[in-house]
A protein has these predicted regions:
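Glycine/proline-enriched, intrinsically flexible loops and inter-domain linkers
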Residues: 1-331
Length: 331
């Protein structure tokens, strides 16, 4: 096979339309509430479901990680999560692979893992339209990126599956599916009672932190925002430094183990704005006052809608949190 260079146009938008863009964004299936799916199934069958989909007083399906207890009396469990970055992979298949892993990890991060990041094992489910020009080369690059990124993080990918005939033929045309990898993550949870939920808590003197895991720019390519603007985007964010990502992950694990977090949520579909909104949705009479002055990026649209890997945390112990983040060289 041969490599093909595919270029997509950058996203055009008007900052003054941010409120309408938000309304449109929240109606996308990838972003909108999933209660149509979760509310029709038993979410606690067997009695060992320690953390199911729903959170908060309003029981909205917002939790990033699922946790099953190992027995009825102990505090150990198994944490699971998934991640994907389909549109991101259209722009850059290597970035798409790393973003899929990053999403799975920033989902499972809210459960205290016995050995931190080293506790995690991944499964890769490949869905790709092979035997079409350029796609075999893209698949090779994507698989190599998963391998390299996982090795750099010190985690394994012992299993997976593939569907490599993702093309539908008609009488006069063909439609190929976008090459996609779905990453599943699993690890041993050391204390099922310490799992952090994405629901802001009404306490005095609390602080909200944004932690950037990617060290990339606030690109809009491959985002849900790009979709509502009828585009894909020219550039997609990636993970620039696996070592820094690993430091961020283990720092958050330390915060969880020391009971320093009130709430936490990853940034994925919909970007930072969706993350902040979701953390307010699950309780009555709850809101947040957010200032974007501390960002080097001055375009609020990019800050709020970019889906580069990162998390939002809430704490009432800012001094202790600052000390731990500083000790891990996280700014």
């Amino acid at each position: 096979d041969k490599s093909l260079l595919r270029k997509y146009e950058s996203i055009s938008y008007d900052v003054d339309e941010i409120y309408q863009d938000t309304k449109n964004l929240l109606q996308l299936e990838a972003v909108a509430c999933k209660d149509w799916l979760t509310n029709k199934v038993d979410r606690c069958v067997g009695g060992k479901v320690a953390k199911q989909q729903c959170a908060g007083s309003l029981q909205l399906p917002l939790n990033d990680v699922g946790v099953m207890a190992l027995d009825f009396q102990g505090k150990s469990g198994i944490a699971t999560s998934i991640g994907h970055a389909v549109a991101s992979a259209l722009i850059d298949e290597r970035a798409g692979s790393k973003n899929a892993i990053a999403e799975a990890l920033t989902n499972i991060i809210w459960a205290p893992l016995k050995e931190g990041l080293q506790s995690v094992s991944l499964s890769a489910n490949w869905m790709w339209p092979c035997r079409n020009e350029g796609e075999d080369a893209r698949l090779y690059n994507a698989v190599e990126a998963v391998s390299d990124f996982s090795i750099a993080l010190g985690i394994n990918v012992p299993t997976g599956k593939d569907s490599l005939s993702m093309k539908q033929k008609y009488a006069d045309e063909e439609v190929i599916a976008p090459g996609t990898v779905i990453i599943s993550a699993a690890g041993e949870c050391s204390d099922i009672k310490k799992v952090v939920e994405p629901v802001f808590q009404l306490v005095e003197n609390n602080s909200i932190y944004y932690i950037d895991f990617s060290e990339d720019e606030f690109h809009l390519g491959g985002s849900s925002f790009a979709q509502i603007r009828n585009g894909i985007g020219e550039n997609t964010p990636s993970i620039n430094d696996a070592a820094y990502f690993k430091k961020c992950f283990n720092a958050v694990q330390e915060l969880i183990n020391k009971d320093l977090l009130l709430a936490g949520h990853d940034i994925s579909a919909g970007g930072m704005l969706t993350t902040l909104l979701e953390m307010c949705f699950a309780e009555n009479n709850l809101g947040a006052d957010i200032h974007l002055d501390g960002f080097d990026e001055k375009d609020p649209t990019k800050i709020l809608f970019s889906e580069k890997s990162g998390i939002i945390i809430q704490t009432a112990k800012g001094i202790e949190v600052d000390e731990i983040l500083t000790s891990h060289d996280i700014s």
